[in-house]
Amino acid sequence: MNVRPEEPGWPLRDRLVVSKGHASCMLYTVLAHRGYFAPAELKTFRQIDSRLQGHPCMLKTPGVDMSTGPLGHGTSVALGMALAARLLEKSYWTYVLLGDGDLNEGQTWEAIMAAAKFKPERLVALIDYNKVQLDGPSEQIMPMDPLPEKRRAFNWNVAPAVYDGHSIVEVLKSFDWVKGQRQWPAAVIYKTHKGQGVSFMEDNAQWHGAVIDDATYTKARQELLQTLQKLEELV
């Protein structure tokens, strides 16, 4: 993304709306590594008076383009940002990251229809499709399949492949596709597993926001460190 960490409010920056605001720890980690704040501040996550709260706040945290939390708002906000770019004759990109719960919300689909009508340039939906949400498997809560066909039926330009959201190579391929598009709005779907990398959490809705104890913390940390080591070997 075209951003300036030293100038978070730069008018020409690309925008990212993390509609699934409960994934804030992921966003904060990326922001820290991009230089918006020191990585040491990550240790204050969800503490009183910390800038890094459980849901991202654009008034507190540099690099956060939109405060999010209640699901379903992100696509509407991103649409507004993309339309603003057109009105202001700016060329920034607007990305919105959605999860399964977002796709259950009626407002999301209203925004999807509106975006197809107004066709703002450089509006891209990134869909984290793990088929698990707060209350259980999405198939039991509110099935979304066939998701690619549904988005196309709403006149979105959907990537021809469903990408592996856990593969950096696949993610980079998806953005190669995005950057080559001229039909808007566009959407990319990523197949993921909730809790990937921690064996006892993977695809298990019971760990959606659950608190771990010392034993599970130790096990999770060991597994994640093993994954990190493998990634560093690839680099």
Language model regions located:
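Structured core elements
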Residues: 17, 124, 160, 187-189
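Short acidic-hydrophobic sequence patches enriched in Asp/Glu that either
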Residues: 37, 143, 212, 216
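Glycine-rich beta-alpha junction loops
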Residues: 22-23, 130-131, 165, 191-195
